[in-house]
Amino acid sequence: EGVSAAYFSAIPSHTHIKGCLHGSKNGFNPNSYNEEKFEFDNALSALTMPSQPQSKKETPGEHGSGTVTPKPPHTLQQIYSMCKNYDCADTYNGITIGQMLLDNRSVYMYPRGVFGWRIIEGKRKRPHFYDAAKKKIFLTAATDEKKYTFILEFDDETLFKEIKNIVFPNRDYPIVVAGNWRSSGSFNMFCMTFLSDKQLKVVK
């Protein structure tokens, strides 16, 4: 997965119709995923875990069965594309899209701020977007008002530098981050602990 730039194509929102194929325009085909097994909080929590080595071990009965059981969206790219595929007021396995992704469409759903497991669509804060001494990276909400600031806090120096170098050249592009957000103690500023490069994507 990593944090290599993901070339998402933003498309107008559509109403969620089971079995429809409009999602293929932004890389998300609803028919390729198991909506009923999707658990948003668990999926985002898994993104904070270190990457596991790929295993070629087959599950019993999978090989030669002629059918492949779809999995729920689980990478940041898949979940973000799914959210962009539908209207923010729609639901996916009973979860409101706008309560999974904060973007320009759903910001009205967050009058008091951003708390808990959420994906945010942000941009590099200007003029300064990081604090090397405190290992923090700052983003602003990629919304018309830009009223929220998001702080990515790092314990690992190497990971901090890696993400800083990803964010630095992409000041004009949306940066998508998944995390467990909490108040920073300052008005309209929210923070999270950044643990894995799977938690961030650049949208181009």
Which ranges hold each PLM region?
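Intrinsically disordered, low-complexity linker/tail regions enriched in polar/charged residues
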Residues: 1-204
